[in-house]
């Protein structure tokens, strides 16, 4: 009898160890999968040699880009300027928004895929492995050469009870972010142009946008050719 009990307890112990090990492996795999979907950006310095007035003076639209890569450091500065957190204690951002809805989502499209910018943490969350720059370019194929394309989307659910005016408020909020991008690009020595032309059907599908999210503006970003 003792032998049988020992065998049973030994078997149960092995089963417990196996379950714990399997759970640990599964948890680790899940964590690794999530980690692989998140890309941390360098902390922005939040500084530039160019003054605001100089940036306003020199800002101009560019539609002819080289394929020179935009560094992660410059991308981080640009995204922070677009709608990054500038008041950490209240989580408020650089761009104003109606009723502080912070409804504008910024997607970053490159040859390696598409990411959603996450201001809280200054990181990118991958949403697609596809190069969506041609879809952003739409009928104006030349701008697809730009190494980065930023896509501005309004999430109407952020307006809550004020949803009736969400379409107009979202468009205005996108304008604020767009202007931040224009001025930051100038200060960083980058080139851009605000555009509305894009293949919205393809982008909505590939970025997994539901009916409450509206594609509004896009910005090819790179260096003038």
Locate the predicted segments by residue.
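Bacterial N-terminal signal peptides that target proteins for export
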Residues: 2-15
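Bacterial Sec-dependent signal peptides at the C-terminal "C-region" and cleavage site
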Residues: 19-37
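A solvent-exposed interaction/effector surface
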Residues: 25, 203-206
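N-terminal amphipathic, basic helical "cap/leader" segment at the start of enzyme domains
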Residues: 31-146
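Short, small-residue-rich loop/turn micro-motifs
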Residues: 45, 152-156, 223
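Small-aliphatic-rich amphipathic alpha-helix that forms the alpha element of a beta-alpha
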Residues: 59, 78, 106, 148-159, ...
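Helix N-cap/coil-helix junction residues
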Residues: 190, 208-209
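A glycine-rich helix N-cap at a beta->alpha junction
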Residues: 209-225
């Amino acid at each position: 009898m003792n032998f049988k009990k020992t065998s049973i307890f030994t078997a149960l112990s092995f089963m417990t160890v196996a379950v714990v090990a399997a759970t640990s492996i599964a948890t680790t795999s899940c964590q690794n999968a999530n980690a692989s979907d998140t890309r941390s950006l360098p902390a922005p310095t939040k500084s530039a040699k160019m003054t605001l007035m100089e940036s306003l003076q020199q800002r101009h639209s560019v539609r002819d880009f080289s394929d020179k890569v935009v560094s992660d450091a410059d991308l981080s500065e640009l995204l922070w300027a677009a709608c990054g957190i500038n008041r950490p204690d209240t989580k408020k951002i650089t761009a104003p928004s109606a009723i502080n809805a912070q409804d504008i989502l910024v997607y970053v499209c490159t040859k390696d895929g598409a990411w959603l910018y996450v201001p809280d943490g200054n990181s990118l969350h991958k949403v697609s492995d596809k190069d969506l720059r041609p879809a952003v370019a739409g009928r104006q194929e030349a701008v697809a050469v730009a190494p980065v394309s930023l896509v501005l989307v309004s999430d109407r659910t952020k307006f809550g009870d004020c949803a009736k005016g969400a379409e107009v408020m979202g468009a205005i909020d996108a304008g604020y972010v767009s202007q931040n991008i224009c001025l930051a690009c100038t200060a960083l020595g980058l080139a851009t142009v605000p555009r509305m032309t894009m293949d919205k059907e393809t982008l909505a599908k590939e970025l997994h946008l539901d009916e409450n999210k509206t594609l509004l503006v896009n910005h090819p970003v790179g260096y003038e050719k």
